[in-house]
Design a protein with these regions (language model features):
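Membrane-interface helix caps of multi-pass secondary transporters
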Residues: 61-77, 104, 121-122, 264-272, ...
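C-terminal transmembrane bundle
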Residues: 56, 88-91, 95, 154-155, ...
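Cytoplasmic helix-loop-helix junction between adjacent transmembrane helices
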Residues: 114-143
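Pair of pore-lining "gating" transmembrane helices in MFS-fold secondary transporters
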Residues: 38-60, 238-259, 332, 340, ...
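Cytosolic juxtamembrane N-terminal segment immediately preceding the first transmembrane helix
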Residues: 1-58, 62, 67, 71
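Conserved MFS/SLC helix-loop-helix module at the cytosolic interface between two early adjacent transmembrane helices
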Residues: 95-113
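Extracellular/periplasmic helix-loop-helix junction of adjacent transmembrane segments
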Residues: 65-95, 138
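Central mid-sequence intracellular linker of multi-pass
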Residues: 2, 34-39, 123, 131, ...
Length: 457
């Protein structure tokens, strides 16, 4: 992240050139993560996605046995979904953690902050937007699939073992994964690699200079910390219409995944008389949708790659908007259409597969929309992408934390049909944001003080 405050112009001050010891020897320097072999880079990406997946299903696994756990502790969900508070606490922490972890990863390296955040790794390994598309798509899928598959895993454990094994199994996986992460994960932050190499190769006389450089690189005041990691994302959220509306869209997409962990239990238990652990298996339909959404994202990546080619007739100034093409059907048909379908097929007289198809559509929409928003914010905001993404990330986790708390009341008081329709109408309104940007994005970016420096020049 930059050093400007949110109220300042996004012009960066000219920084002094680093000493030779803190530069790559040439563009082919083998220690530069951009030059690592593809197998090594993709190994790191695969490990990052794996960690994201297992941490994600940790958030929602408890939902698969919420009723039994509530009965054990004497917690009632009759008037309020108190059993969802563990998930709310997890997602609230996920909203706050990036503001702490990202500075650690940027200043001290990836390894110290790796167990708490992985999405920043992709930018360290892939230098251009085209090659970055696929790993980011994989990252978004691992995030969504992890939180969606949680109730399925929890339901299976509850059916065949005891609900406490939901937590025991997670401890086993985390303890088993930590040595692998510690041994396999390599540092990917270029400045940190250079600093370590300089210290390794420096003479005794040079060690003092290196220590001073290291101290300068790792120093940031609490005021600077707040400005860069809290004030600027918040400032962009309330002053940048693109960040504001895209945060709402991606937050709703993410929140719907968590709402389903509550609504599916209500719908399928009441309409079809299924036991709790069986209703949890329905969440697998959303994972199927997310996988189909990943395939659509691969096609979207192809469209961007084609537009990025030198012979393409797409103006370079319009490249960020190419990222949004598939988000239009993803939001209109996937999110809004899937919610309408899910709601208005929730009748006892209809086969259970019909509302399940609606859930699959919402999975497609969530995957396509979240990937498009992440890529657009990265490309359009360039060096301010971290702040824009932090705002969107906070919004996603806040919606995921608190929107499901209203699910029980909504689906009880409004009925299954209109509760889903309320969310569908909100999604329908927000679905126009990508259309506006596709037609007027270049003009909007010129008006924005943060986006005025185009990502592609």
């Amino acid at each position: 992240m930059g050093t400007d405050t949110a109220s300042e112009s996004p012009e960066s001050p000219v920084e002094p050139h680093p000493p030779d010891a803190l530069r790559w020897t040439d563009e082919h320097d083998p220690e530069n993560p951009f030059n690592w072999p593809a197998t090594r880079r993709w190994g790191v990406v695969g490990l990052a996605c794996y960690v994201t997946f297992i941490v994600g299903w940790n958030a929602t696994t408890v939902s698969g046995a919420a009723i039994e756990i509530g009965e054990y502790f004497g917690v009632s969900d009759q008037s309020f979904p108190n059993s969802f508070w563990p998930v709310t606490s997890w997602t609230t922490g996920a909203a706050v953690a990036p503001m702490i972890v990202l500075p650690i990863m940027e200043d001290f390296g990836v390894r110290p902050g790796y167990l708490d955040g992985t999405d920043g790794i992709v930018a360290d390994l892939f230098p251009d937007p085209v090659r970055r598309s696929l790993p980011i798509s994989c990252y978004v899928f691992s995030l969504l699939a992890g939180v969606t598959i949680g109730p399925v895993i929890g339901g299976a454990i509850k059916e065949h073992l005891y609900w406490r094994w939901i937590f025991y199994s997670q401890l086993c996986i985390y303890f088993g994964s930590f040595p692998m992460i510690f041994l396999i994960m390599k540092e990917t932050r270029g400045p940190v690699i250079l600093l370590k190499r300089a210290r390794r190769n420096a003479s005794n006389q040079q060690q003092g200079n290196i220590s001073e450089l290291e101290k300068q690189q790792h120093h940031f005041s609490p005021v600077q910390f707040l400005k860069e990691n809290v004030v600027r994302p918040g400032y962009m959220l309330v002053t940048e219409p693109v960040v504001f509306f895209f945060t709402l869209l991606t937050a709703l997409s993410y929140g719907i995944v968590f709402v389903s962990s509550q609504s599916v239990t209500q719908v399928f238990m009441k309409l079809y008389g299924w036991p709790e652990h069986t209703t949890a298996y329905v969440q697998a339909a959303i994972v199927v949708g997310e996988f189909l959404g990943l395939l659509i994202c691969l096609y979207q990546n192809y469209l961007f790659e084609r537009a990025f080619r030198p012979q393409s007739r797409t103006p370079k100034s319009r490249l960020p908007e190419v990222r949004l093409y598939m988000s239009i059907p993803g939001s209109f048909i996937g999110l809004a259409g899937g919610l309408f379908w899910y709601g208005w097929t929730s009748y006892r007289s209809l086969h259970w597969i019909l509302p399940t198809i609606g859930l699959t559509l919402t999975g497609i929409g969530s995957m396509v929309v979240m990937q498009a928003v992440m890529m657009y914010l990265t490309d359009a905001y360039a060096k301010y992408a971290a702040s824009a993404s932090a705002a969107a990330c906070a919004g996603e986790n806040i919606f995921a934390a608190f929107l499901p708390l209203a699910a029980q009341s909504m689906y009880t008081n409004l009925g299954f049909q209109w509760a889903s329709s309320v969310l569908a109408f909100i999604a329908l309104g927000l679905s126009f944001a990508p259309i506006v940007l596709i037609f007027y994005g270049e003009t909007i970016r010129k008006w924005s003080p943060f986006m005025s420096q185009a990502a592609y020049e």
